[in-house]
Structures are given as C-alpha cells and as structure tokens.
C-alpha cells in the first residue's frame, strides 16, 4: 500500500576536523539504520567536519577534506538503497554555506543551505557562513571533479527545495530554523510536506532539553506531520557538550527518544510510521487547509524511490511514548562526566589530578569524575567495545577490563589535599574520607615551606614582612598572604600531575582539574593563577545552589556518606589563620553576598540583560518583602563593583563545561570589557536618585548615602 515509512535519526559523537573518525561514524550509523529497515537516514549538523571547527571553516582544507569524505560516503556500498542526509560546509559562487547534502545511490539529489543561522550565546555562525536568503529558489551547483567522478553529475540543485519521493514529501530544517519565529516547517507543511527533518548542533544547558522537545512536538501539533531530529553528541573540542536527544515525533507526540548522555559514539533511532495518520490528522484542521490553499509552492525534486514498501500491512507501527527528562542533578552527574571522558580519551592522557580541599566545589568535581568511572564500567558491561578500547589505552593495559568504578578510579584519578598552617583537621579528614569512598589515589602534602620561602624572598628584598589582619596587618597584607597560599598550590598541582604516575611506575601524565563554580567566577571570588588555574573545569558553568543539590543526589544515589559532613560545613577558602583550631573565614562573609544572591545577580545581568540601574529596578520589587530600596541599592552597587574589579580574571579562566546561560565565560559566551570604570558614577547616581524618590514618596528621612 505504501503508507508505512521507516526513517532514522542519529546522534553521533563527532570531533572537529577528525575527518577519518567522523566518516567512520557516519558510515556505521548508515549501516545500522539500514539493518533496522530505515529508508532514510538523517545525521547531525556539519557532521562530516564536526560542528566546532570555528575559524577552521575559513580554510580551504576544511572544504576539500569534507568533499573527500563525501566522495567516500557516495562510493560506499553502505549508502546504497537508502536516502542519506549528511551535513558539511561548502562554497557556492565564492560564498560559504552550512549545508545538507542529500543523496541516493551515488546521485546527489539536493544541496540545501541553511536559512537561519545561529548567532547568539556560544554560536557564531554568521562569522563563517552566509544564510540562504532566496526563499523557494534553486540554482545549479557545479560539483568539484572529485564528486563528478563518483556521481557522473556535473551540476546538482542547490537551494530551498523539498524532495518528492514516490510515496511522500520531505522538507529540511537545520537546527536554528526550528527555533526561529518563522520556521520553514510551517510553510512546508502547508505545501504538503509530510516529513520534516532537522539536523542539529545543539549543546547542553541545564534544564534546556524540555524546550527542544517541546519545539519539535509543537512543530507538528498544529499542522500535522512527522518530525525527525538528529543532533551531535559529546565534546568535539571545546567547552560545549552536545547532548544528543535524537528524536522522532508525529502529530505532536514523541514516538522515539534517544539518550541525552551516553558514551556510545553512534546512536541510531528508527521509527516506522503510517503516513495516513498524518493525512487524517490534517484533514480535520480546517484552518490549516484554508491556509494551504494560499501558500506559494516549494520547488520539488522528484526522487524515484519510496520510503515505504508496497506490502506493509504486517509492518508494526510505532506508538507515542512519554519523554523521560533528567532532573538537574542527573544532568550534572552525567553531562560533565561524559564531557570529561571525551576530553580524557581524545587528549591521550592517563587520567586526572584534582586539588581536593574537602569543600563542596572540589568534592562535586570529584563526584563527577567518579560518575565518569561508573559510566565507563557500565558501558563496558553493556558491551561497548569502543569504551573498553579507550579505557585500555588510558591505563596502558591491553588486557584490562574496567568492572569496578572504585578500582578504575584508583587508576585514572589522583586527588591531592594541599594543607597549610591555616587548614583545619576537619577539611583534611573530609577530603581523605571522600577519596577513600570513590577510590581515588589520594595524596596529602603541606605547602607551608613553599609559602614561607616566597614570603621570605619578599622580606629579604624589601626589609618588610607582611602580616595577617588578625596579627595587626593591613587589608593589603592580609590579601597578599592569602593569594600567596592560593597561587603556590597551582605549581605542585601541575608537578604532581606530571610525575605522580611516574612515582607509581605507571606511564603517562594527568590533566589538572579546576573547581571554581559559576557564581564565584561571576563575583571574581577566586585568585588569579591559583589552583583554579587548571587544564579544564567540569563545574565552572554550574551554580553553587545546583552543586549543593548534586552533592545531596550523590549521597542518596552513590552512598557517599563522606559528603554529609561536607554539605553541613560552611564554604571556606581556609586562607586566614584559624581561631582556636577552628575556621574563622567563610566564603559568603568574604564576598559580602550570599550564593543565592549571586545566582540572581548573574541571571539578571546576563539573561535579563540588566545593567546596574535595571537590576536595581527589578530587585526592589523582587525583594520588597526583605529589603528596603536603600538596602537593595547597596547590594546592587557592591555586586557591580566586585564584578567589574574582578572581570579581568575571566580572561584567563580555565576552560569550563558550559552549563548555565548566565555564565561569565569570557571566551565567546559573555563578551565584555575587562577594564571598567569601577565607580559606575552615572549608573549609581541614577540608582541613588530613584532611592531618594522612593524614600520621599514613603516619607522616609535618611542621611545621604555615601556608599
């Protein structure tokens, strides 16, 4: 009858410029799709070269090697008798485009350039590509000789068209086009397109997955149709983790769901769906049919191929399922862990070293590494031969099988407690107990000799000896002595990362992990070039509030009882002298604000685009039950002073896993100056004027604010 179509969506762990590996994963996904009965296979955005090539897109080599891979795909027997939809950059009339190349049996059917480019947040597509602005227009694209020799075609259609097979009609969207207000699927659906495809390069952000799922389902809820979404997965070379979530939806309901976090390099979803369900769904939507009668038609590329078989009554049809979302704590547990695994295996290092202080942040980082070890053991148990091969390379043992997370952790994870005279026995014990429970190779060392040597050099040169404030020193002296301790810790961290495995008779070196959270980075509550200066930081995009919830999750799910005392202890840097052996310094007292307040400031500054005055205006309403306008003004001023004074620290911040949309990451997400006029005189005067107006209105008499 020709009504049951079988289609495949893929999530591939591609790597920028890894043309060899990318081609292998694409071919494997096509073979899997065919083995499951699919007649159409959709891959992620720019899958041939990997999405994160950045300025390598300018290079002609990137285009050349992409065409070489395309030729390999066209020639492969695996790509025969299935419509293959792959992504790559190419140049048309001296303009670079982000494209889908759709082919069947060594013939290119259509090259579809991206219409709406992603250019916000971490995305910079307009830097490298140009959008195709010729709606419903097709031109002839002259193929390079390397492709002509395979296909026998000189030119192929290039532009905004749809494919008309023998049994249905397919239309293409590329990532951002689904998120755009005028998504192409709207007009395509009105023009009779029944299957919409979307190849994405969408990265993970906490609590974002439901938005993507809702967009896909809503795309066909009003207009009917089948929607296929493929996405990249894994770390392809930078701060982002692409979180898969391949899915297939029909008439507003999910029928197939892929994993969001997985160590599988290739994941293929196949669904068989009844086209008559789409047609009957549309038939009763009179508003849709009236709109369809007025739509301008898309150019149709006729394809002598069917996505269904002639006798399909016995083919089982997929039914709707309920999408299973991860909690934020599960996302923190799994996303950064998968990112760390990709970084470790692709950097060809032998593990990680973490300065473990016994506080929440470094403990959360340790738990993420432990989660990675659990994921590796689970993947090997489930038969993932690639993970097993990677694990053996990392530990330099061709017969090794990671079965126990603690045992694997001992091989690949070193933790180091770096004590000073200001460290408490409590934090030392907490770090030791947590290391024992997760299985890391743990080291205790003391940095006092190094600190005294450096301060001694200063005293010898200047004739002056700085003192902590509790001993009569000035604020400058106090801060300098704290920073010396913090900075000294960076040097042994890298030394032990290079040589710890050597002392254990094991080959390789370790990557140093940092543990500064997103709130502390925003406030600048960290020492430049201290042990937060590391190779990578898995928690740098995560708030303190979420980290606390994650720690509680680990207590409940991993039975890490050592975390209970860590959760109960107030966060402290332990850089000032102890009082009667007890900690006298706390982070929130040092910062002059709470972590909860910092999260609010961060979201207003970045997500709500609020400067000092706008933030004040929003907070006087948000906090009207707990703060007077003058108190709100004081808090806002203090935040912006500290933010601007410390912004320079972001320029050298350790590359961090991107998890929050209010991240202050200076690399490309949050582009700001790092030399500010920290008085904010005009802005703060506007706040003061508004405070005076509000107090006058309320009949409050307050002395002039000199803050």
Curated annotation (Swiss-Prot):
Q: Which InterPro entries match?
A: C-N_Hydrolase (IPR003010), C-N_Hydrolase_sf (IPR036526), Gln-dep_NAD_synthase (IPR014445), NAD/GMP_synthase (IPR022310), NAD_synthase (IPR003694), Rossmann-like_a/b/a_fold (IPR014729)
The protein depicted here goes by the name Glutamine-dependent NAD(+) synthetase
Q: Which reaction does it catalyse?
A: deamido-NAD(+) + L-glutamine + ATP + H2O = L-glutamate + AMP + diphosphate + NAD(+) + H(+)
- The keyword NAD belongs to this UniProt entry's keyword annotation: yes
Which parts of the sequence belong to the CN hydrolase domain? Answer: 5-275
Query: Do you know which Gene3D superfamilies this protein is assigned to?
Result: Carbon-nitrogen hydrolase, HUPs
Listed NCBIfam families: nadE
* Catalytic machinery residues: 45, 114, 175, 357
Identify the EC number(s).
Answer: 6.3.5.1
Q: How does it assemble?
A: Homohexamer.
Q: Which organism is it from?
A: Gallus gallus
List ligand-binding residues for ATP. 355-362
User: PROSITE patterns of this UniProt entry?
Assistant: CN_HYDROLASE
- Record's function text: Catalyzes the final step of the nicotinamide adenine dinucleotide (NAD) de novo synthesis pathway, the ATP-dependent amidation of deamido-NAD using L-glutamine as a nitrogen source.
Give the UniProt record's GO annotations in the biological process aspect: 'de novo' NAD biosynthetic process from L-tryptophan; NAD biosynthetic process
């Amino acid at each position: 009858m020709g009504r049951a179509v079988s289609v495949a969506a893929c999530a591939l762990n591609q790597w920028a410029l890894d043309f060899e590996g990318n081609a292998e994963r694409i071919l494997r996904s096509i073979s899997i799709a065919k083995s499951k009965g699919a007649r159409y296979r959709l891959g992620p955005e720019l899958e041939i070269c990997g999405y994160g090539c950045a300025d390598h897109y300018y290079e002609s080599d990137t285009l050349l090697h992409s065409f070489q891979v395309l030729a390999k795909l066209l020639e492969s027997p695996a790509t025969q008798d299935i419509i293959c939809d792959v992504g790559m950059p190419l140049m048309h009339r001296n303009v670079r485009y982000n494209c889908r190349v759709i082919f069947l049996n060594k013939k290119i059917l259509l090259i579809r350039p991206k219409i709406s480019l992603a250019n916000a947040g971490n995305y910079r597509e307009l830097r490298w590509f140009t959008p195709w602005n010729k709606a419903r227009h097709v031109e002839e694209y002259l193929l390079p000789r390397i492709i002509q020799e395979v296909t026998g075609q000189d030119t192929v259609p290039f532009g905004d068209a749809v494919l008309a097979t023998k049994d249905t009609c397919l239309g293409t969207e590329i990532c951002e086009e689904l998120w755009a207000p005028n998504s192409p699927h709207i007009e395509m659906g009105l023009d009779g397109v029944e299957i919409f495809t979307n190849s994405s390069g969408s990265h993970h952000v906490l609590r974002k997955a439901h938005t993507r799922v809702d967009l896909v389902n809503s795309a066909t809820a009003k207009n009917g149709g089948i929607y296929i979404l493929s996405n990249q997965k894994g770390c392809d070379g930078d701060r982002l983790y692409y979180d898969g979530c391949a899915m297939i939806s029909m008439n507003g309901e999910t029928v197939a769901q892929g994993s969001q976090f997985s160590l599988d390099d290739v994941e293929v979803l196949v669904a068989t769906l009844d086209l008559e369900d789409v047609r009957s769904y549309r038939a009763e939507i009179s508003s849709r049919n009236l709109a369809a009668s007025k739509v301008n038609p898309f150019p149709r590329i006729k394809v002598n191929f069917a996505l269904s078989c002639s006798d399909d009554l016995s083919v089982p049809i997929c039914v709707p399922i309920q999408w299973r979302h991860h909690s934020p704590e599960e996302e923190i547990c799994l996303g950064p862990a998968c990112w760390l695994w990709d970084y470790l295996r692709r950097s060809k290092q032998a593990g990680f070293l973490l300065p473990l202080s016994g506080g929440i942040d470094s403990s959360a980082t340790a738990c993420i590494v432990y989660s990675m070890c659990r994921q590796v053991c689970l993947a090997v148990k489930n038969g993932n031969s690639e993970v097993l091969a990677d694990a053996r390379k990392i530990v330099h043992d061709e017969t090794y099988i990671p079965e126990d997370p603690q045992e694997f952790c001992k091989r690949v994870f070193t933790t180091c407690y770096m004590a000073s005279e200001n460290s408490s026995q409590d934090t030392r014990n907490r770090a030791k107990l947590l290391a024992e429970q997760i299985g890391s190779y743990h080291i205790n060392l003391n940095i006092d000799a190094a600190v005294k040597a450096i301060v001694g050099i200063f005293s010898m040169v200047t004739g002056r000896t700085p003192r902590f404030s509790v001993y009569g020193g000035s604020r400058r002296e106090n801060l300098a002595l704290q920073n010396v301790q913090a900075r000294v810790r960076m040097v042994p961290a890298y030394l032990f990362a290079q040589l710890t495995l050597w002392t254990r008779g094991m080959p390789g070196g370790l990557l140093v992990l940092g543990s500064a959270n997103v709130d502390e980075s925003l406030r600048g509550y960290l020492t430049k070039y201290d042990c937060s200066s590391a190779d990578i930081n898995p928690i740098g995009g995560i708030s303190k509030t979420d980290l606390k919830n994650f720690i509680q999750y680990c207590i409940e799910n991993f039975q890490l009882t050592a975390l209970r005392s860590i959760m109960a202890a107030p966060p402290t840097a332990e850089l000032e002298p102890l009082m009667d052996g007890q900690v006298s310094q706390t982070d929130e007292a040092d910062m002059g604000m709470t972590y909860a307040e910092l999260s609010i400031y961060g979201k207003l500054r970045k997500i709500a685009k609020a400067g000092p005055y706008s933030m004040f205006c929003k907070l006087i309403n948000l906090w009207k039950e707990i703060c007077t306008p003058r108190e709100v003004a004081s808090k806002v001023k203090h935040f912006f002073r500290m933010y601007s004074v410390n912004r320079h620290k972001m320029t050298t911040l350790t590359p961090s896993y991107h998890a929050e949309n209010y991240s202050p990451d200076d690399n490309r997400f949050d582009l700001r100056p790092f030399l500010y006029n920290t008085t904010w005189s005009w802005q703060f005067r506007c706040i003061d004027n508004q405070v005076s107006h509000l107090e006058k209105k309320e009949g409050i008499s307050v002395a002039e604010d000199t803050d």
